[in-house]
Amino acid sequence: YLDEVQAAHLLDLLDDEPIVYRTMITLLLHTGLRRGELCGLEWDDINFDLSLLDVQRTSLYLPEKGVFVDETKNSTSRRVLKLTPDAVQLLKRYRMWQNSERLRIGDQWAEEWEQHPRLFTTWDGKPLHPSTVTGWFHTFIERSDLPPISIHSLRHTNATLLIAAGTNVRTVSSHLGHAQTSTTMNIYSHSIKSAEAAAAEALQSVLTRKKKQA
């Protein structure tokens, strides 16, 4: 995963990339979504007034079925996330870009999009293959000066940064859609211990100062 400085650098590098991939990667970093959850998003899932994202489904691929939508990984994966102001603004710009693309492409735009208005599609409005974003991100990382991380590492980065910022484990677990809090604790035990150590040091610093003043 990336640390705070590397994550900020990633966002800076994305400024020069196509808006569709800039939006996808930024959203993954800001929300901790799974790849399939990202690809399954529809515009009705976003409440721009309240800055909320409703995670309702996941997009998958099987050779015998092609790209299809399924329920989320588990019942707790069905969740509502609060979007950051930066993510909301980027989504608004991306929606304007997609609307202009629909007008430009015209009749070639997939009819099915009207019933299921996906955020992220092929050039003609069809469901995006989940591996498309994986392949793009792999190439992007190779030509960057960032560590060799995978697309799933963005989910770990999101969780690690939340923990480092002092977010409690139960909230992080709910945010990630984990079935059990113990899953979060097992995966991020090192980050949790580091955050606890930092909290202990901060408390020690405060109490030591109070003691000296007394």
How would you label these PLM feature ranges?
Residues 26, 30-37, 131-132, 136-143, ...:
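C-terminal catalytic core of tyrosine-transesterase DNA break-rejoin enzymes
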Residues 1-41, 49, 60, 76-78, ...:
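Basic, Lys/Arg- and aromatic-enriched nucleic-acid-binding interface segment
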Residues 17-19, 126-133, 147-153:
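N-terminal core-binding DNA-recognition domain of tyrosine site-specific recombinases/integrases
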Residues 12-15, 50, 61-87, 93, ...:
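C-terminal secondary-structure termini that scaffold catalytic or DNA-interacting sites
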Residues 45-52, 148, 167-187:
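Short, polar N-cap/turn motifs at the start of nucleic acid-interacting alpha helices
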Residues 59-61, 88, 176-202:
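Catalytic-site neighborhood detector that most strongly recognizes the C-terminal catalytic loop/helix
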